[in-house]
Structure formats: structure tokens, C-alpha cells
Amino acid sequence: MGSLSPWHWVVLVVVVVLLFGAKKLPDAARSLGKSMRIFKSELREMQTENQAQASALETPMQNPTVVQSQRVVPPWSTEQDHTEARPA
């Protein structure tokens, strides 16, 4: 029980041929193969993208730039007159 004997495979093949017909089987196999090739190429492409992203994240910065902090004076500083706009 549980394993398929050669007779099971023969019956399965006969049922598939009867269901799909002998003319449609080559087309079905061809489209299945084409779909598998597309799927594999997409997987390969995703893996190369992930590897490129991982290598970009792993490379340390060669020459980090030191930035000095600067004081930013807001336009409404206390040195200017404070006027409030009043609605007309």
C-alpha cells in the first residue's frame, strides 16, 4: 500500500490519454515545459537581484565623510520685530 506499482502507472497514463486526447498531449507538455522554463528564469533573476542587494549592503563605506554641524537661524528669530498679521 502507498507505493504505485507499474500497473497503476499504466492505468494512470491511459486515463490521461482518454481525458485529454492524443492530439492535445504534446501541446500540453510543450506549454508545461515553457511555463517551467519561465518560472526557473524568474527564480534565477530574483536570486541574482537578492545577491546584488546583499553584496551592496555588506560592502562598507570606503571614505566616510565627516559633516560639521551648523546652527540654523529660523526666519522668525528674536532679533526681528514681531508683527502679527491681522485679518482685514
Swiss-Prot record:
Which N-terminal stretch is annotated as signal sequence? none
Q: Which GO terms describe its molecular function?
A: protein transmembrane transporter activity
Where it sits in the cell: the answer is: Cell membrane
Is Transmembrane helix one of the keywords UniProt gives this record? yes
Coiled-coil intervals, chain numbering: none
- Keyword list, A-Z: Cell membrane, Membrane, Protein transport, Translocation, Transmembrane, Transmembrane helix, Transport
Q: Which GO terms describe its cellular component?
A: TAT protein transport complex
State whether keyword Protease applies.
no
**GO biological process terms, semicolon-separated:** protein transport by the Tat complex
Polar residues compositional bias: what residue ranges?
49-71
- Provide the topology term for how it sits in the membrane: Single-pass membrane protein
Assembly and oligomerization: The Tat system comprises two distinct complexes: a TatABC complex, containing multiple copies of TatA, TatB and TatC subunits, and a separate TatA complex, containing only TatA subunits. Substrates initially bind to the TatABC complex, which probably triggers association of the separate TatA complex to form the active translocon.
What PANTHER family is this protein classified in? SEC-INDEPENDENT PROTEIN TRANSLOCASE PROTEIN TATA
Q: What is this protein called?
A: Sec-independent protein translocase protein TatA
Please tell me the species this chain comes from: Mycobacterium leprae (strain TN)
Q: What is the lineage of its organism?
A: Bacteria, Bacillati, Actinomycetota, Actinomycetes, Mycobacteriales
- Per UniProt, what is the name of the gene that codes for the protein in this document? tatA
